Amino acid sequence: MASALTTQGTAITMKQLLEAGVHFGHQTKRWNPKMKPYIFGARNGIYIIDLQKTVGLARGALRFVSDAVAKGGMVLFVGTKKQAQDAIREEASRSGQYHVTNRWLGGTLTNFKTVKQGIDRLKTIEKMAADGTYERLPKKEVAQLEREREKLEKNLGGIKEMSRLPAAIFVIDTKKEHIAVHEANRLGIPVVAVVDTNCDPEGIEYVIPGNDDAIRSIRLFTGKIAEACIEGRARYSTWAAQHGEERRPGEEDRDAASERGQKDRRDRRDRRGGGRDRERREPREDRAAASANVEVVRKGEVTPAQPAPGSDANR
Protein backbone atom coordinates (compact mmCIF):
# COMPACT_ATOMS: atom_id res chain seq x y z
CA MET A 1 0.00 0.00 0.00
CA ALA A 2 1.57 3.26 -1.08
CA SER A 3 2.01 6.05 1.40
CA ALA A 4 0.02 9.19 0.82
CA LEU A 5 0.65 11.94 3.33
CA THR A 6 -1.67 14.44 1.79
CA THR A 7 -3.60 15.93 4.70
CA GLN A 8 -2.80 19.32 6.18
CA GLY A 9 -2.18 17.73 9.59
CA THR A 10 0.81 15.70 8.43
CA ALA A 11 2.39 18.45 6.31
CA ILE A 12 5.46 20.04 7.89
CA THR A 13 6.96 23.31 6.70
CA MET A 14 10.00 25.47 7.31
CA LYS A 15 7.77 28.19 8.74
CA GLN A 16 6.37 25.85 11.39
CA LEU A 17 9.87 24.77 12.39
CA LEU A 18 11.10 28.36 12.69
CA GLU A 19 8.10 29.45 14.77
CA ALA A 20 8.59 26.51 17.14
CA GLY A 21 12.31 27.25 17.62
CA VAL A 22 13.30 23.86 16.26
CA HIS A 23 16.57 25.29 14.88
CA PHE A 24 18.06 26.16 18.30
CA GLY A 25 20.53 23.51 19.41
CA HIS A 26 22.63 23.30 22.56
CA GLN A 27 25.67 25.36 23.49
CA THR A 28 28.62 24.61 21.23
CA LYS A 29 30.61 23.17 24.14
CA ARG A 30 27.90 20.54 24.74
CA TRP A 31 27.61 19.07 21.27
CA ASN A 32 28.01 15.56 19.92
CA PRO A 33 30.35 15.56 16.88
CA LYS A 34 28.18 12.91 15.20
CA MET A 35 25.50 15.59 14.77
CA LYS A 36 27.79 17.73 12.60
CA PRO A 37 26.04 16.78 9.31
CA TYR A 38 22.79 18.23 10.66
CA ILE A 39 24.22 21.53 11.95
CA PHE A 40 24.08 24.68 9.83
CA GLY A 41 26.45 26.74 11.98
CA ALA A 42 26.83 28.50 15.33
CA ARG A 43 25.56 31.83 16.60
CA ASN A 44 26.27 33.38 20.00
CA GLY A 45 27.69 30.10 21.28
CA ILE A 46 24.63 28.08 20.25
CA TYR A 47 24.48 25.63 17.37
CA ILE A 48 21.88 26.30 14.68
CA ILE A 49 20.30 23.17 13.22
CA ASP A 50 19.96 22.91 9.44
CA LEU A 51 16.18 23.09 9.06
CA GLN A 52 16.28 22.19 5.40
CA LYS A 53 17.57 18.77 6.41
CA THR A 54 15.05 18.62 9.24
CA VAL A 55 12.14 19.14 6.83
CA GLY A 56 13.25 16.36 4.47
CA LEU A 57 14.06 13.88 7.23
CA ALA A 58 10.84 14.65 9.13
CA ARG A 59 8.78 13.98 6.02
CA GLY A 60 10.51 10.65 5.54
CA ALA A 61 9.85 9.74 9.19
CA LEU A 62 6.17 10.66 8.86
CA ARG A 63 5.82 8.50 5.75
CA PHE A 64 7.40 5.56 7.56
CA VAL A 65 5.13 5.94 10.61
CA SER A 66 2.01 6.20 8.46
CA ASP A 67 3.01 3.10 6.49
CA ALA A 68 3.80 1.11 9.65
CA VAL A 69 0.40 1.87 11.18
CA ALA A 70 -1.36 1.26 7.85
CA LYS A 71 -0.02 -2.30 7.99
CA GLY A 72 -1.66 -2.85 11.38
CA GLY A 73 1.32 -1.87 13.52
CA MET A 74 1.36 0.31 16.61
CA VAL A 75 3.79 3.04 17.66
CA LEU A 76 5.15 3.47 21.18
CA PHE A 77 5.64 7.14 22.12
CA VAL A 78 8.46 7.66 24.66
CA GLY A 79 9.15 10.92 26.51
CA THR A 80 9.77 10.99 30.26
CA LYS A 81 11.30 14.47 30.64
CA LYS A 82 8.98 16.98 32.30
CA GLN A 83 8.35 19.20 29.28
CA ALA A 84 7.57 16.19 27.05
CA GLN A 85 5.22 14.22 29.29
CA ASP A 86 1.96 16.04 28.54
CA ALA A 87 2.51 16.19 24.78
CA ILE A 88 3.49 12.52 24.58
CA ARG A 89 0.54 11.38 26.70
CA GLU A 90 -2.04 13.53 24.91
CA GLU A 91 -0.92 12.87 21.35
CA ALA A 92 -0.40 9.13 21.84
CA SER A 93 -3.88 8.85 23.36
CA ARG A 94 -5.41 10.98 20.59
CA SER A 95 -3.93 8.74 17.92
CA GLY A 96 -4.70 5.49 19.73
CA GLN A 97 -1.05 4.54 20.30
CA TYR A 98 0.98 3.47 23.35
CA HIS A 99 3.09 5.76 25.51
CA VAL A 100 5.64 5.84 28.33
CA THR A 101 5.87 9.15 30.22
CA ASN A 102 6.82 8.33 33.81
CA ARG A 103 10.02 6.32 33.51
CA TRP A 104 11.29 3.62 31.24
CA LEU A 105 11.29 0.27 33.01
CA GLY A 106 14.29 -1.78 31.98
CA GLY A 107 13.11 -4.70 29.85
CA THR A 108 9.91 -3.03 28.68
CA LEU A 109 10.71 -4.35 25.20
CA THR A 110 13.44 -6.95 25.67
CA ASN A 111 11.69 -8.63 28.61
CA PHE A 112 8.12 -7.88 27.60
CA LYS A 113 6.85 -11.23 28.91
CA THR A 114 7.68 -10.16 32.47
CA VAL A 115 6.32 -6.65 31.95
CA LYS A 116 3.12 -8.22 30.62
CA GLN A 117 2.66 -9.88 34.01
CA GLY A 118 2.54 -6.44 35.62
CA ILE A 119 0.00 -5.31 33.02
CA ASP A 120 -2.15 -8.38 33.72
CA ARG A 121 -1.96 -7.63 37.45
CA LEU A 122 -3.10 -4.05 36.83
CA LYS A 123 -6.08 -5.25 34.81
CA THR A 124 -6.97 -7.77 37.51
CA ILE A 125 -7.07 -5.09 40.21
CA GLU A 126 -9.12 -2.79 37.97
CA LYS A 127 -11.59 -5.61 37.40
CA MET A 128 -11.84 -6.19 41.16
CA ALA A 129 -12.67 -2.52 41.66
CA ALA A 130 -15.29 -2.59 38.91
CA ASP A 131 -17.12 -5.84 39.71
CA GLY A 132 -17.72 -5.13 43.39
CA THR A 133 -14.96 -7.33 44.81
CA TYR A 134 -13.64 -4.36 46.81
CA GLU A 135 -16.90 -4.21 48.76
CA ARG A 136 -16.31 -7.71 50.15
CA LEU A 137 -12.73 -7.03 51.25
CA PRO A 138 -11.41 -5.40 54.45
CA LYS A 139 -10.65 -1.68 54.10
CA LYS A 140 -6.95 -2.27 54.81
CA GLU A 141 -6.66 -4.75 51.95
CA VAL A 142 -8.53 -2.43 49.61
CA ALA A 143 -6.13 0.39 50.51
CA GLN A 144 -3.16 -1.86 49.73
CA LEU A 145 -4.67 -2.85 46.39
CA GLU A 146 -5.30 0.79 45.51
CA ARG A 147 -1.70 1.72 46.26
CA GLU A 148 -0.53 -1.15 44.09
CA ARG A 149 -2.93 -0.13 41.31
CA GLU A 150 -1.77 3.50 41.39
CA LYS A 151 1.88 2.45 41.14
CA LEU A 152 1.20 0.07 38.26
CA GLU A 153 -0.96 2.64 36.47
CA LYS A 154 1.78 5.24 36.80
CA ASN A 155 4.41 2.97 35.25
CA LEU A 156 2.36 0.80 32.89
CA GLY A 157 -0.85 2.71 32.19
CA GLY A 158 0.35 3.92 28.80
CA ILE A 159 1.14 0.40 27.59
CA LYS A 160 -1.78 -1.34 29.31
CA GLU A 161 -3.26 -2.44 25.98
CA MET A 162 0.08 -3.39 24.41
CA SER A 163 -0.30 -7.13 23.81
CA ARG A 164 2.65 -7.37 21.43
CA LEU A 165 5.78 -5.42 20.55
CA PRO A 166 5.29 -2.14 18.67
CA ALA A 167 6.14 -1.70 15.00
CA ALA A 168 8.21 1.39 15.88
CA ILE A 169 9.01 3.73 18.77
CA PHE A 170 9.00 7.52 18.68
CA VAL A 171 11.41 9.17 21.13
CA ILE A 172 11.90 12.66 22.50
CA ASP A 173 15.49 13.09 23.79
CA THR A 174 17.47 9.99 22.85
CA LYS A 175 20.14 10.87 25.39
CA LYS A 176 17.70 10.56 28.28
CA GLU A 177 15.88 7.60 26.73
CA HIS A 178 19.02 5.70 25.70
CA ILE A 179 17.82 2.48 27.35
CA ALA A 180 14.63 2.49 25.28
CA VAL A 181 16.65 3.10 22.12
CA HIS A 182 19.06 0.29 23.02
CA GLU A 183 16.24 -2.19 23.62
CA ALA A 184 14.58 -1.28 20.33
CA ASN A 185 17.90 -1.69 18.50
CA ARG A 186 18.40 -5.16 20.01
CA LEU A 187 14.99 -6.26 18.75
CA GLY A 188 15.23 -4.60 15.35
CA ILE A 189 12.37 -2.21 16.11
CA PRO A 190 12.81 1.01 14.07
CA VAL A 191 13.39 4.17 16.11
CA VAL A 192 12.02 7.56 15.07
CA ALA A 193 13.40 10.37 17.20
CA VAL A 194 13.88 14.09 17.60
CA VAL A 195 17.66 14.35 17.97
CA ASP A 196 19.28 17.49 19.40
CA THR A 197 22.88 18.63 18.89
CA ASN A 198 24.03 16.98 22.14
CA CYS A 199 22.68 13.53 21.20
CA ASP A 200 24.12 10.52 19.38
CA PRO A 201 22.22 9.79 16.13
CA GLU A 202 23.67 6.28 15.86
CA GLY A 203 21.02 3.59 16.19
CA ILE A 204 18.23 5.96 15.13
CA GLU A 205 16.71 4.78 11.85
CA TYR A 206 14.75 7.99 11.34
CA VAL A 207 16.64 10.99 12.72
CA ILE A 208 14.69 14.26 12.98
CA PRO A 209 17.30 16.93 13.85
CA GLY A 210 15.72 19.45 16.17
CA ASN A 211 15.30 21.10 19.55
CA ASP A 212 14.18 18.42 22.02
CA ASP A 213 13.81 20.78 25.00
CA ALA A 214 11.45 23.55 23.87
CA ILE A 215 7.81 22.69 24.54
CA ARG A 216 6.61 24.13 21.21
CA SER A 217 9.14 22.04 19.30
CA ILE A 218 8.18 18.89 21.20
CA ARG A 219 4.47 19.51 20.62
CA LEU A 220 5.01 20.18 16.92
CA PHE A 221 6.82 16.92 16.22
CA THR A 222 4.69 14.81 18.57
CA GLY A 223 1.54 16.19 16.97
CA LYS A 224 2.81 15.45 13.46
CA ILE A 225 3.70 11.86 14.39
CA ALA A 226 0.24 11.46 15.92
CA GLU A 227 -1.37 12.75 12.71
CA ALA A 228 0.69 10.26 10.69
CA CYS A 229 -0.59 7.48 12.97
CA ILE A 230 -4.19 8.64 12.54
CA GLU A 231 -3.76 8.70 8.78
CA GLY A 232 -2.20 5.24 8.86
CA ARG A 233 -5.11 3.89 10.91
CA ALA A 234 -7.57 5.33 8.40
CA ARG A 235 -5.73 3.58 5.57
CA TYR A 236 -5.69 0.37 7.58
CA SER A 237 -9.44 0.59 8.23
CA THR A 238 -10.09 1.13 4.53
CA TRP A 239 -7.99 -1.89 3.63
CA ALA A 240 -9.67 -4.07 6.27
CA ALA A 241 -13.12 -3.02 5.07
CA GLN A 242 -12.26 -3.93 1.50
CA HIS A 243 -10.63 -7.26 2.30
CA GLY A 244 -12.75 -8.28 5.28
CA GLU A 245 -9.81 -9.39 7.38
CA GLU A 246 -7.33 -8.03 9.87
CA ARG A 247 -3.64 -7.70 9.18
CA ARG A 248 -1.20 -8.11 12.02
CA PRO A 249 2.45 -7.19 11.51
CA GLY A 250 4.61 -10.29 11.93
CA GLU A 251 8.33 -10.62 12.35
CA GLU A 252 8.79 -10.14 8.62
CA ASP A 253 7.29 -6.64 8.89
CA ARG A 254 9.80 -5.64 11.56
CA ASP A 255 12.66 -7.13 9.52
CA ALA A 256 11.51 -5.20 6.46
CA ALA A 257 11.20 -2.03 8.52
CA SER A 258 14.70 -2.58 9.91
CA GLU A 259 16.07 -3.03 6.39
CA ARG A 260 14.34 0.19 5.32
CA GLY A 261 15.93 1.94 8.28
CA GLN A 262 19.39 0.71 7.31
CA LYS A 263 18.85 1.81 3.71
CA ASP A 264 17.62 5.19 4.96
CA ARG A 265 20.81 5.64 7.02
CA ARG A 266 22.94 4.79 3.98
CA ASP A 267 20.97 7.27 1.89
CA ARG A 268 21.44 9.99 4.50
CA ARG A 269 25.19 9.37 4.60
CA ASP A 270 25.28 9.68 0.80
CA ARG A 271 23.32 12.93 0.94
CA ARG A 272 25.47 14.62 3.58
CA GLY A 273 26.97 17.70 2.05
CA GLY A 274 25.12 17.18 -1.24
CA GLY A 275 23.15 20.31 -2.12
CA ARG A 276 21.83 19.11 -5.50
CA ASP A 277 20.02 16.09 -4.03
CA ARG A 278 18.53 18.32 -1.38
CA GLU A 279 17.22 20.77 -3.96
CA ARG A 280 15.56 17.98 -5.92
CA ARG A 281 13.95 16.72 -2.74
CA GLU A 282 12.63 19.99 -1.30
CA PRO A 283 9.73 22.04 -2.69
CA ARG A 284 10.66 25.46 -4.02
CA GLU A 285 8.85 27.36 -1.26
CA ASP A 286 10.82 25.50 1.43
CA ARG A 287 14.10 26.26 -0.33
CA ALA A 288 13.13 29.93 -0.36
CA ALA A 289 12.25 29.82 3.33
CA ALA A 290 15.55 28.09 4.05
CA SER A 291 17.43 30.83 2.21
CA ALA A 292 15.62 33.44 4.27
CA ASN A 293 16.53 31.58 7.43
CA VAL A 294 20.18 31.42 6.38
CA GLU A 295 20.19 35.17 5.74
CA VAL A 296 18.73 35.84 9.19
CA VAL A 297 21.47 33.77 10.80
CA ARG A 298 24.22 35.47 8.79
CA LYS A 299 22.98 38.91 9.78
CA GLY A 300 23.09 37.95 13.43
CA GLU A 301 19.36 38.40 13.93
CA VAL A 302 18.89 35.05 15.61
CA THR A 303 17.78 35.36 19.22
CA PRO A 304 18.32 32.30 21.42
CA ALA A 305 15.03 30.78 22.60
CA GLN A 306 14.13 31.06 26.26
CA PRO A 307 14.55 27.77 28.16
CA ALA A 308 11.30 25.90 28.63
CA PRO A 309 10.00 25.45 32.20
CA GLY A 310 11.68 22.48 33.75
CA SER A 311 14.39 22.32 31.10
CA ASP A 312 18.13 22.85 31.40
CA ALA A 313 18.65 26.60 31.42
CA ASN A 314 22.17 26.20 30.02
CA ARG A 315 21.43 24.67 26.64
Curated annotation (Swiss-Prot):
One of its GO terms (biological process) is translation. GO terms for molecular function: structural constituent of ribosome. Residues 241-315 are annotated as: Disordered. The keyword Membrane does not apply. The keyword Ribonucleoprotein applies. Residues 243-288 have a biased composition (Basic and acidic residues). It holds the Pfam family Ribosomal_S2. One of its GO terms (cellular component) is cytosolic small ribosomal subunit. It comes from the Bacteria. CDD domains: RPS2 (cd01425). Keywords: Ribonucleoprotein, Ribosomal protein. PANTHER family: 30S RIBOSOMAL PROTEIN S2 PROKARYOTIC AND ORGANELLAR, SMALL RIBOSOMAL SUBUNIT PROTEIN US2M. Belongs to the universal ribosomal protein uS2 family. This is Small ribosomal subunit protein uS2. The gene is rpsB.
